[in-house]
Amino acid sequence: MQFHPEALATAGDSISARFFYFLVQKAATYRHAKEIHRRILSLDTHTDTPLDFDVSYNIGTREKTQVCLPKMREGKLDGQYLACWVRQGPCDEENSLKAIDRVDELIRHIYRQVEMNGEQCAIARTPDDLSRLKTEGKKAFYIGIENGYGISKDLKNITRFHDAGVTYITLCHTRNNDICDSSSDTTARWNGLSPYGRKVVKEMNRLGIMIDLSHAAESTFWDVLKYSKAPVIVSHSSASAIYRHDRNLTDEQLRA
């Protein structure tokens, strides 16, 4: 864009001159932001975009979802976690198997999107993958599972999902499950982690899958910190002191 307000300013149009100065300042800020993003690695740790991955969807084109490859390029976003979300249902065998099938389906959809746009993106599993893909001019997609309901009561599912590329699991969603208590549920079932949940934490540690504590009750949060041998993440939570929400963390939790 070129704009020459000199004649207007000479003629006494100081408003145009101030507007030009405003544009110059904005351009300088944008240039500075671009330089920062050139030097750093940026990663968004949660989006539910895979829920929109139907047969007509193409993440390589401009879609109405919050995340797609054109928007990632415009926002200078290097990597994105795609969450395989499953709604909490009854903790019986029939419904648990449906949840597992749903996670499998969403993972297949993610791989299909990446295969359709292999020249622009790839599945990532490690921090080094993010750096490598940025160097190659590609965007990185990581896979997470939102709600441990999707692994049911079989620890072997954790290994299977790990082998499929899953690198974090959010232990629960808005209701208690067989693993732990949720921050959104009005009643406590386990007062933190269940006995099975402790096994889940141990197995995730063994495999190197990150434990995500967004949606976890505070009692669950402290239990996980007690039993986990690895650092944890909170993929889509903020500070309760700034905004009161059951998914957000107290100052004490943030300091931990």
Where on the chain are the PLM-derived regions?
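Short, catalytically relevant binding-site loops at active-site mouths
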Residues: E218-S219, A239-A241
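Histidine/acidic residue-rich metal-binding segments in metalloenzymes
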Residues: K153-D163, D185-I233, D246-A256
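Short, ordered loop/turn segments at secondary-structure junctions
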Residues: T10, W85, T174, A216, ...
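Amide-donor transfer/coupling interface in amidating biosynthetic enzymes
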Residues: M1-R31
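Histidine-centered catalytic micro-motifs
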Residues: M1-E6, S42-T49, A216, V234-S237
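N-terminal hydrophobic targeting/anchoring segments and the immediately downstream early-domain regions
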Residues: A27-N191, R244-R255
